[in-house]
């Protein structure tokens, strides 16, 4: 272990030596750039672009380009990047993460690699965690970029598609991670190429990269539409039943935060819902409602996991920032179950139309880098998931902050009593204090206690984060006391007021250890910026969430040995800190394993999504007749139907193929048994394809010009693809839940998921081609005048496609259709799951 650690440290040192040499080359241009006039310095941008176009690489331009940005920043912003900032910029350009402490000027560091990569003209995305930082950084740094001749765009959720397209067309685009993800998904749902807003994803520089790529890695971005179903009553019934349970009726696993019914709970459910067996196949939907009601009532906590807004809406609280996540909803019915629990209006369920996780979104960029003050603890995950190295950058000035050892109290009450006393004493001497909490509930509790103690303070949590930047900016003033949920206000520097340095600087007090060491380090890092003095102190209790879930037994034993009878007794020891860090490492390991598994599942979806989106993009951008592609779909559909019927005896086979042809290819009275009898399978395939092409040509002939034909073909294909893809996503979600149970049968759930999803994907492709064939053959296309506008073309095409194939006639003879044959109605389903379903 010691050897591994030594190797890592030596590698870091070697990397830093290389970076220092490169930074010195940038600094060597300092006098040359200072001697240039404004016009000469600004002209460098066009010179670099020309040199890049003539074959020079960005790596070759780096030293001079970085020097131009340094000089430009000095003239425009009054800021001159230090050598360590130049080193950080080089790391960013190479597609890695420089770990730079809070207050070391990460925003200014980013200007150099952003400028350099923007010279290529392929777009640079600077990604921030919220829109306040997006606008702030784009406005402040945009001055420099504009002065140097580069265009800057700001992408906000409220902007129109036209404004978004303009923002993405700029050399540099500032945006939140969520908005880039949603724009990507929406771009893959449009019908016309001109409605897409993004260019191909080129280079992303992610601010607070650990927050986005690690903490939010599991969060799927979902574009969804409503599902018409009257299920509100079931949510209320399940909630009412769950609230009637005693503690013995359910089992909670505190460590994994899972819950299930005990035998007595199952008995009560069968009695309450009047069932013979709760786990009969017919009751699968009901058990899902009960499971969600259990989670909502006994796992999900008000003011910790979510808050109820003034508008009676359930808002999710981000566990890593303490902010509410506007517009986000728990999936799979959990959000509705919480609404039932809290007695607020239940919003309708939705069906996923498109989704992607941040892991797979950001892995699509050609080059990815990011900045943070705390990434080294997650180095393995950055390397394994994103192929990114983490390189610690030295501070410009030595860190003067004093980090005190943790204090452990027997109970939460005694802990908070000590926190309030400490805050009061520091406030009275004028030292500013930042109190960090992990939950809204804790913030409110400490606030109440400080009011009782007569200590004036500001509270910053999920309930009032609109003024967070202003509150955080004032947190370093003399006598200021600020309570902040976790890392709220991250990205905004706390600058010390007059006379505060002499009082010891800002004191950060942590009221609980977070499950991630990185989050604790971020809280500590709010103090002691740029060599300022400061202090940090964590207060813990045996009743804290982390201590309850992981590793508290040894610490309890330690307490017993010390025989602490006084409630206000406190432990302060190195062993305690080591035990807490060991507990945090276990949680981090669990979370990493979970994220890895999510990625394994999502990689399956990613491969399928990329195939569908690539095909979709090809259709949207095609400036040609798509008849060859549609002909191929028709041919494959016919082949599948004929091959699928070959196992039947001759009469049954002819009957099944005839029904398919009548209801999906040609008019009913234009084909009969005699047309198919006596032919081999290949001859039947050739005959039906020939007949289908005749119908296809007659359908196309009804459209008066090539533009109308292309529009009709595009809308037809896209409509079918989007419908089937949405159903497929829904089916994959259900499959993922189902394969989890197969793990109990000693099967690997991920392997099962991969195999089953591959089969389902192939089925979906067949279903897409079947529907395109059926709609193409049976759509009722009316002769029309040439439409005057694109909108008219689209409307007409959509209206034409809306004409469905005729339903199965009441007197249709289905006696010879086998259960596993395709249903002759043309639904694409097997007969047993369609018109052959037992009533």
From Swiss-Prot:
Q: Where is this region: Disordered?
A: 800-839
- Please note every region of biased composition (Basic residues): 829-839
Q: Which residues bind ATP?
A: 85, 103-107, 493
Which CDD domains does the record associate with it?
A: DEXDc_SecA, SF2_C_secA
Q: What is its main location?
A: membrane
Instruction: Tell me the GO BP annotations in alphabetical order.
Output: intracellular protein transmembrane transport; protein import; protein targeting; protein transport by the Sec complex
Molecular function in Gene Ontology: ATP binding; metal ion binding; protein-exporting ATPase activity
Q: Where does Zn(2+) bind?
A: 823, 825, 834-835
| Location of the protein in the cell | Cell membrane; Cytoplasm
Among InterPro entries, the record links this protein to: Helicase_ATP-bd, Helicase_C-like, P-loop_NTPase, SEC_C_motif, SecA, SecA_CS, SecA_DEAD, SecA_motor_DEAD
Superkingdom, taxonomy of origin: Bacteria
Q: Does the keyword Heme apply?
A: no
The alphabetized UniProt keywords are:
ATP-binding, Cell membrane, Cytoplasm, Membrane, Metal-binding, Nucleotide-binding, Protein transport, Translocase, Translocation, Transport, Zinc
Required co-factors: Zn(2+)
| Functional note | Part of the Sec protein translocase complex. Interacts with the SecYEG preprotein conducting channel. Has a central role in coupling the hydrolysis of ATP to the transfer of proteins into and across the cell membrane, serving as an ATP-driven molecular motor driving the stepwise translocation of polypeptide chains across the membrane.
Q: How does it assemble?
A: Monomer and homodimer. Part of the essential Sec protein translocation apparatus which comprises SecA, SecYEG and auxiliary proteins SecDF. Other proteins may also be involved.
This protein's name: Protein translocase subunit SecA 1
What organism is the protein native to? Streptococcus sanguinis (strain SK36)
């Amino acid at each position: 272990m010691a050897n591994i650690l030594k190797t890592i440290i030596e590698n870091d040192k070697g990397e830093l030596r290389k970076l220092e040499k490169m930074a010195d080359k940038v600094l060597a241009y300092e006098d040359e750039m200072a001697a240039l006039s404004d016009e000469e310095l600004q002209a460098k941008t066009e010179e670099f672009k020309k040199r890049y176009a003539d074959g020079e690489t960005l790596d070759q331009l780096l030293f001079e380009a970085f020097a131009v940005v340094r000089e430009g920043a000095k003239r425009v912003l009054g800021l001159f990047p230090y050598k360590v900032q130049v080193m950080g910029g080089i790391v960013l350009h190479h597609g890695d993460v420089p770990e730079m402490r809070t207050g070391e000027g990460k925003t200014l560091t980013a200007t150099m690699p952003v400028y350099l990569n923007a010279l290529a003209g392929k777009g640079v995305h600077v990604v921030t965690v919220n829109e306040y930082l997006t606008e702030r950084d784009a406005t402040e740094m945009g001055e420099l970029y504009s002065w140097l001749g580069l265009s800057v765009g700001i992408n906000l959720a409220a902007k129109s598609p036209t404004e978004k397209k303009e923002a993405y067309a700029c050399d540099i685009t500032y945006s939140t991670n969520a908005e880039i993800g949603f724009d990507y998904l929406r771009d893959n749902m449009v019908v016309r190429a001109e409605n897409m807003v993004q260019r191909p994803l080129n280079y992303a520089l992610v601010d607070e990269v650990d927050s986005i790529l690690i903490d939010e890695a599991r969060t799927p971005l979902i574009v969804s539409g409503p599902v018409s179903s009257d299920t509100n009553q079931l949510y209320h019934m399940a909630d009412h039943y769950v609230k009637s349970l005693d503690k013995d009726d359910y089992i909670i696993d505190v460590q994994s935060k899972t819950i299930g019914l005990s035998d007595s709970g199952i008995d009560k459910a069968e009695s309450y819902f009047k069932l013979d067996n709760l786990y009969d196949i017919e009751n699968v939907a009901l058990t899902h409602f009960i499971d969600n009601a259990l989670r909502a009532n006994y796992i999900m906590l008000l003011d910790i996991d979510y808050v109820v807004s003034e508008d009676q809406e359930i808002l999710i609280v981000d566990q890593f920032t303490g902010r509410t996540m506007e517009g986000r909803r728990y999936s799979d019915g959990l959000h509705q179950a919480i609404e039932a629990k809290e007695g607020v209006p239940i919003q309708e369920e939705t069906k996923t139309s498109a989704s992607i996780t941040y892991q797979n979104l950001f892995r699509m960029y050609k080059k990815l880098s990011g900045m943070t003050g705390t990434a080294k603890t997650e180095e393995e995950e950055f390397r394994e998931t994103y192929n990114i190295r983490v390189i610690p950058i030295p501070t410009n000035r030595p860190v003067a902050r004093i980090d005190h050892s943790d204090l452990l109290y027997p109970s939460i009450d005694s802990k908070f009593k000590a926190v309030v006393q400490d805050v009061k004493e520091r406030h009275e001497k004028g030292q500013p204090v930042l109190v960090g909490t992990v939950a809204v509930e804790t913030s409110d509790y400490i606030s109440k206690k400080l009011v009782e103690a007569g200590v004036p303070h500001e509270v910053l949590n999920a309930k009032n984060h609109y003024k967070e930047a202003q509150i955080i900016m004032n947190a370093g003033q003399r006598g200021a006391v600020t309570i902040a949920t976790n890392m709220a206000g991250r990205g905004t520097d706390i600058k010390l007021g007059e006379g505060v340095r002499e009082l010891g600087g800002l004191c950060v007090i942590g009221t609980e250890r977070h499950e991630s060491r990185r989050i604790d380090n971020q809280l500590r890092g709010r103090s002691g910026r740029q060599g300022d003095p400061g202090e940090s102190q964590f207060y813990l209790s045996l009743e804290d969430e982390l201590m309850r879930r992981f590793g508290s037994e040894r610490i309890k034993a330690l307490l017993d040995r010390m025989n602490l009878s006084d409630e206000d007794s406190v432990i302060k020891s190195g062993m305690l800190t080591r035990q807490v860090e060991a507990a945090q490492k276990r949680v981090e390991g669990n979370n990493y394993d979970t994220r890895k598994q999510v990625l394994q599942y999502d990689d399956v979806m990613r491969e399928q999504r990329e195939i569908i989106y690539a095909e979709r993009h090809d259709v949207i951008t095609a400036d040609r007749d798509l008849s060859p592609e549609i002909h191929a779909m028709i041919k494959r559909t016919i082949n599948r139907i004929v091959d699928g019927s070959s196992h039947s005896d001759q009469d049954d086979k002819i009957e099944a193929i005839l029904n398919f042809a009548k209801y999906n290819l040609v008019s009913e009275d234009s084909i009969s048994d005699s047309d198919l009898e006596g032919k081999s399978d290949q001859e039947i395939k050739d005959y039906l394809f020939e007949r289908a092409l005749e119908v296809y040509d007659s359908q196309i002939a009804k459209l008066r010009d090539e533009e109308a034909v292309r529009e009709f073909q595009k809308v037809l294909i896209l409509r079918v693809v989007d419908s089937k893809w949405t159903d497929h996503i829904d089916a994959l979600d259900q499959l993922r839940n189902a394969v989890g149970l197969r793990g109990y049968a000693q099967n690997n759930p991920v392997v099962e998921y991969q195999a089953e999803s591959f089969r389902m994907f192939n089925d979906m492709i067949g279903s897409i081609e079947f529907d395109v064939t059926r709609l193409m053959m049976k759509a009722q296309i009316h002769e029309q005048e040439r439409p005057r506008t694109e909108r008219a073309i689209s409307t007409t095409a959509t209206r034409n496609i809306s004409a469905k194939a005729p339903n199965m006639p009441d007197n249709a003879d289905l006696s010879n259709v086998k259960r596993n044959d395709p249903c002759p109605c043309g639904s694409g389903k097997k007969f047993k799951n369609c018109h052959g379903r037992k009533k």
